[in-house]
């Protein structure tokens, strides 16, 4: 079925939902795992015209290469911690057809991804998707500017209260970190506006901002530390009113490895899941744990992400999935 969506400015955006057969990974106590992963340019072998040149059949991109990438992606998603329900944000996925192919793969079909929503700019090569084992109540797409990826808002009505996912993919640093910083601030400002409206209309709801933000939470640009920041998204290592809990700031966790993306031999904490104060308010879904998927086929022998290499047709992704888990309050 088609999910209700909001269309702003002249950007044509798409959102879909699909039902398919499947069941939850584990049974017993209710639990929720929310994850975010930039899959690094996951394209099928069908020519749509908007692909990057290297993913066109004329460049040698094939169905077998596509299926290999699907298989690897599904294996990595299978490394997520066991839960009774799952919501996963995927960046850099081509279109809804690729989402459908991915969630039907054997390694993750047992998770029970019944629903999904996608958003992207008209003519853009990649989209952001939210896949879920929980029914999607509604989805809206919020434009940022003509040359920026939209914000995908997805609403869930669970047994433990309302949950909203704001799926993002902020502007990359291509062109210079400082030169592109204003674009990430623009996106973060839209996220702030959306989240405030959501919380005003749904007091006590849980809101999560998930995706590749292309900068770190202490960079004092789109995000900044709650105590003294004027940034659009104020973050903290604990759950405070009018701020977002950011696990990258929580030094008590000792997360390994030290980031989700490696650039110039340095770990970067670009992929994020920001949790609203409702994640620790004693009601509904309560934050439990967090982590980074760094095992199996996504980890190289020298402790790096096994990046996808189009020329060699090998690898998985240059980003690692990050995740948080929740349990219902007792």
Task: Report each predicted region and the residues it spans.
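Active-site beta-strand/loop signature of hydrolases that rely on acidic residues for catalysis
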Residues: 34-39, 73-100, 165, 191-224, ...
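N-terminal, active-site-proximal structural segment of metallo-dependent hydrolase catalytic domains
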Residues: 18-105, 120-121, 304, 308-310, ...
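Active-site His/acidic residue clusters
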Residues: 50, 166-180
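Metal-dependent phosphoester-hydrolase catalytic domains
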Residues: 20-24, 197-207, 215-330
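Second-shell loop/turn segments in exported
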Residues: 57-64, 84-90, 118, 141, ...
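Structured beta-strand-rich core segments of catalytic domains in phosphoester-bond hydrolases
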Residues: 39, 93-171
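Bacterial N-terminal signal peptides
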Residues: 8-17
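Bacterial N-terminal signal peptides that target proteins for export
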Residues: 1-7
């Amino acid at each position: 079925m088609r999910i209700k969506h909001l269309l702003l400015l002249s950007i044509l955006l798409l959102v879909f939902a699909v039902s398919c057969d499947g069941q939850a990974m584990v049974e017993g106590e209710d639990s929720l795992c929310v994850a975010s992963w930039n899959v690094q340019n996951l394209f099928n072998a069908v020519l749509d015209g908007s692909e990057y040149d290297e993913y066109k059949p004329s460049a040698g991109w094939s169905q077998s290469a596509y299926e290999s990438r699907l298989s690897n992606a599904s294996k990595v998603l299978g490394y997520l911690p066991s839960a009774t329900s799952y919501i996963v944000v995927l960046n850099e996925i081509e279109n809804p057809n690729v989402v459908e192919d991915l969630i039907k793969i054997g390694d993750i079909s047992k998770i029970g991804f019944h629903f999904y929503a996608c958003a992207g700019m008209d003519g853009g090569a990649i989209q952001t998707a939210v896949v879920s084992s929980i029914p999607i109540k509604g989805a809206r797409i919020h434009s940022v500017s003509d040359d920026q990826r939209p914000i995908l808002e997805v609403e869930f009505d669970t047994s433990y209260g309302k949950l909203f996912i704001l799926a993002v993919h902020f502007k990359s640093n291509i062109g210079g970190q400082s030169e592109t910083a204003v674009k990430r601030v623009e996106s973060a400002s839209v996220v702030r506006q959306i989240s405030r409206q959501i919380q005003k209309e749904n007091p006590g709801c849980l809101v999560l901002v998930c995706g590749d933000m292309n900068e770190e939470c202490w960079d004092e640009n789109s995000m900044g530390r709650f105590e003294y920041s004027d940034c659009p998204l104020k973050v903290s290592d604990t759950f405070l009113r009018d701020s977002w809990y950011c696990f990258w700031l929580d030094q008590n966790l000792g997360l390994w490895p030290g980031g989700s993306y490696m650039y110039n031999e340095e770990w970067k904490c670009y992929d994020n899941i920001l949790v609203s104060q409702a994640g620790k308010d004693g009601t509904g879904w309560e934050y439990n744990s967090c982590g980074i998927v760094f095992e199996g086929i996504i980890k190289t022998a020298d402790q790096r992400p096994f990046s996808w290499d189009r020329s060699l047709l090998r690898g998985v992704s240059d980003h690692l999935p990050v995740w948080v888990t929740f349990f219902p309050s007792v």
